[in-house]
Each structure stands twice: as structure tokens, then as C-alpha cells.
């Protein structure tokens, strides 16, 4: 659960930041107003795609590690019910792929031709989150060790207070 919360914080934080930066430039929330942003905002497109891949639970991202641990832990407790609950991952994946397709493919719409790509300070802010998403996806050991140690200490504190 700690891994899932950490992954969610990183992915949701990056997604809200990137969507906010896009809205700041375009002043529209309608996804139908966008297309082929990869041509006019390539850095934004890269960061948003990695973030959406993490939301899907793609291997190599923190989303995969978190979902894998949640499914394995849940399967040990609830068995085949987790297979049914795993369908939500497929629904989320379909949503993310549709979002990628609508934002980054098709012809460039005239009103989107002059959108400015991410500025340096925006790159740094989004980059920190995206690097953490990938780093913890490729090397989750520090995060797992930290959460294991913390949970062990919490368990000791609770068991001592019960006695």
C-alpha cells in the first residue's frame, strides 16, 4: 500500500502539473481541441507520455512496481477476486491510450500551432517527478527498504502500546 501511495503521488502530481501547464497555454479543457501536440510541444509530449505509461502500470515505471505488489499482496489474501479487480487496470490502460492518441496524433489544429513548449523551470519541476517515476520503476529497492523499515517500526510501536 505504501508503494501504491508513493506511485500515486508521483504520477498524479506529474499529471496535474502537466495538465495545468497545458491549460495555462490553451485555456481549454476539451480534449477534442487538441491533436498532434508532439509536433509543437515535444518535451511536454515526452513527459506526459511517460506519466500516462506509469498510470497504466507499464514496466519500467513506479506504477508497475506498485500495481504488481498490490496485486500479489491482494491475491495472497483474496485469491481469484483480484483477477476481477485487475480488470480495472485494463480500463485505466484503455483510457490512458485514448488520451495519448487524442493529444499527440492527427493533424496539428490551427489554434495549437503557436503553443510554447515547456520552459526551463517547468522542465525542472516536471523532470523531477518524471525522473522519480522512472528511477523508482527501474530501481525500487530504496523505496521498498524505506517502507519496510517504517512499517516495521510502526508495528513495534503499536504492539508495545497494546501490551
Predicted regions and their residues:
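The feature identifies polytopic integral membrane transport proteins across all domains of life
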Residues: 1-2
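Interfacial and helix-entry/exit segments of alpha-helical transmembrane bundles
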Residues: 9-92, 111-132
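Cytoplasmic/organellar membrane-interface segments at the starts of transmembrane helices
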Residues: 41-43, 97-163
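Long, well-ordered mid-to-C-terminal structural blocks that present hydrophobic/aromatic surfaces
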Residues: 5-6
Amino acid at each position: 500500500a505504501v508503494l501504491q501511495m508513493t506511485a500515486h503521488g508521483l504520477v498524479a502530481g506529474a499529471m496535474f502539473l502537466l495538465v495545468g501547464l497545458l491549460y495555462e497555454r490553451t485555456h481549454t479543457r476539451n480534449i477534442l481541441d487538441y491533436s498532434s501536440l508532439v509536433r509543437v510541444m515535444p518535451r511536454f509530449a515526452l513527459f506526459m507520455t511517460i506519466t500516462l505509461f506509469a498510470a497504466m502500470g507499464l514496466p519500467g515505471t513506479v506504477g508497475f512496481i506498485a500495481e504488481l505488489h498490490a496485486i500479489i499482496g491482494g491475491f495472497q489474501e483474496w485469491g481469484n477476486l483480484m483477477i476481477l479487480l485487475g480488470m480495472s487496470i485494463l480500463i485505466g490502460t484503455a483510457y490512458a491510450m485514448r488520451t495519448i492518441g487524442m493529444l499527440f496524433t492527427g493533424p496539428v489544429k490551427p489554434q495549437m500551432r503557436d503553443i510554447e513548449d515547456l520552459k526551463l523551470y517547468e522542465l525542472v519541476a516536471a523532470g523531477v517527478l518524471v525522473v522519480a517515476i522512472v528511477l523508482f520503476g527501474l530501481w525500487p529497492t530504496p523505496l521498498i527498504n524505506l517502507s519496510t523499515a517504517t512499517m516495521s517500526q510502526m508495528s513495534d510501536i503499536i504492539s508495545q502500546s497494546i501490551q
